[in-house]
């Protein structure tokens, strides 16, 4: 099994697209990239810990490759927005691909270069590619949020889905 970590704005919106793929064993919401051990949601939202909201994905590389996960990641995000994603603003919502191995780093960097070269976006691709840091599991009420709170999830993801439809379909 392998591990991937992606930050793409609110972690509520990043779970379902990955969870629906064959070869995914788990998708957990949490926090990474900051300086405070085991931060709370409130601390991360206060923008004082340096963490991003992210998802940790455990996957079977025999069924789905890391490259496929990176490609799926792109189409869940606005890779031209370094200051958050959609209605979620601030450093804690910035887009980041966290790599756990040098091979993951190479795959992510090549994928980013390919996306930039594709001309799909007029602006530069600003998603950063950074080494993975400790991943702290978010509180239980954040896990599987789209299943537990479908109406609130639909409301909170509406702007994202509109962008994805307009730019990735």
UniProtKB/Swiss-Prot annotation:
Upper lineage: Bacteria, Bacillati, Bacillota, Bacilli, Lactobacillales
Hydrolase among keywords? no
What Pfam families does its record include?
Answer: PMSR
Q: Which UniProt keywords apply?
A: Oxidoreductase
Q: What does this protein do?
A: Has an important function as a repair enzyme for proteins that have been inactivated by oxidation. Catalyzes the reversible oxidation-reduction of methionine sulfoxide in proteins to methionine.
User: Which EC class is this protein assigned?
Assistant: oxidoreductase
Q: Which InterPro entries does the protein's record reference?
A: Met_Sox_Rdtase_MsrA_dom, Met_Sox_Rdtase_MsrA_sf
Some GO term, biological process aspect, for this entry: which one? protein modification process
Reaction catalysed by this chain? L-methionyl-[protein] + [thioredoxin]-disulfide + H2O = L-methionyl-(S)-S-oxide-[protein] + [thioredoxin]-dithiol; [thioredoxin]-disulfide + L-methionine + H2O = L-methionine (S)-S-oxide + [thioredoxin]-dithiol
Q: Which NCBIfam families match?
A: msrA (TIGR00401)
- Reply yes or no: does the keyword Oxidoreductase apply: yes
Query: Gene behind this chain?
Result: msrA
Q: What is this protein called?
A: Peptide methionine sulfoxide reductase MsrA
Give the residues annotated as active site: 10
Q: Please tell me the species this chain comes from.
A: Streptococcus pyogenes serotype M28 (strain MGAS6180)
PANTHER family from the UniProt entry: PEPTIDE METHIONINE SULFOXIDE REDUCTASE, PEPTIDE METHIONINE SULFOXIDE REDUCTASE MSRA 2
Give the EC number.
Answer: 1.8.4.11
Write out the similarity annotation. Belongs to the MsrA Met sulfoxide reductase family.
Listed Gene3D superfamilies: Peptide methionine sulphoxide reductase MsrA (3.30.1060.10)
GO terms for MF: L-methionine:thioredoxin-disulfide S-oxidoreductase activity; peptide-methionine (S)-S-oxide reductase activity
